[in-house]
Regions:
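Glyoxalase I/VOC metalloenzyme domain signal
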Residues: 1-56, 63-110
Length: 110
């Protein structure tokens, strides 16, 4: 065939994705962001999307087995990123830059 196609359903929404070999390849210019309420959700989506050949990337990014890019980010990170306290913003950013899968407990100083 000229392309690989996959169907998936995310929270009730159907998606059809395709990779057309050298014609159209997935890249990081297009990614899905999953905002997670807690570490349990981060772990769930991270494990599911990296299974069967997916690849971990830096800073909460990963590629699924089809090569599609995802960002799995806890809502706590977005809250810290927008926090009025610049030190909290900076700490969270520096922490995420050292991670692959984001660990919620490590986003704030102890």
């Amino acid at each position: 065939t000229f392309f690989d196609m996959a169907m998936m359903n995310l929270q009730g929404m159907d998606f059809q994705i395709l990779a057309a070999g050298p014609l159209f390849k997935f890249n990081e210019a297009i990614s899905f962001v999953i905002t997670c309420k807690d570490q349990k959700e981060v772990d769930y989506y991270w494990k599911a999307l990296t299974a069967k050949g997916g690849e971990e990337g830096p800073c909460g990014w990963l590629k699924d087995r089809y090569g599609l890019s995802w960002q799995v980010v806890p809502e706590q990170y977005f809250k810290l990123e927008a926090h009025k306290n610049k030190a909290k913003q900076e700490y969270a950013l520096k922490a995420v830059l050292k991670m692959k899968k984001i660990i919620v407990a490590d986003l704030e100083e102890k």
